């Protein structure tokens, strides 16, 4: 299993638009083969920080997701709504 934790920094004026785009991404992704979990959260202390938590059956399933047309479309469209590149951590469970 592969876990991804991605942290994005949103602009306040475009937060709702980016959340809508993220909702579309989640709705499509959870149907994708190999996706175990794909959730979006807002930081309680800073609502302009969004955290995506993903779990995939394998690295191959994750790669299929990140190479998909819909993923590239939403990521490229969302670039104008974030203040810096997302922090992405690809993790493996150790305990």
Question: What is each stretch, according to the model?
Answer:
Residues 2-8, 39-65:
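Short, well-ordered beta-strand segments in beta-rich or mixed alpha/beta enzyme
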Residues 3-9, 21, 51, 55, ...:
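Generic alpha-helical hydrophobic packing signal
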Residues 14, 48, 70:
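Short phosphate-engaging motifs
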Residues 28-36, 55-88:
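An amphipathic, aromatic/His-enriched active-site/gating alpha helix that lines ligand/cofactor pockets
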Residues 15, 19-23, 50-52, 61, ...:
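Residue-level detection of beta-strand scaffold positions
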Residues 2, 39-48, 76-95:
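Glycine-rich beta-strand-turn "strand-cap" elements at beta-sheet edges
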Residues 3-30, 35:
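N-terminal first-folded block
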């Amino acid at each position: 299993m592969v876990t991804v934790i991605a942290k994005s920094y949103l602009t306040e004026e475009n937060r709702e638009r980016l959340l809508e785009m993220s909702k579309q991404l989640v709705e499509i992704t959870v149907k994708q083969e190999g996706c175990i979990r794909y959730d979006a959260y807002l930081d309680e202390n800073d609502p302009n920080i969004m955290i995506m938590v993903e779990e995939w059956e394998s690295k191959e399933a994750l790669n299929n997701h990140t190479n998909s047309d819909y993923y590239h479309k939403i990521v490229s469209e969302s670039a104008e709504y974030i203040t810096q590149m997302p922090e992405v951590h690809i993790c493996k469970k150790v305990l």
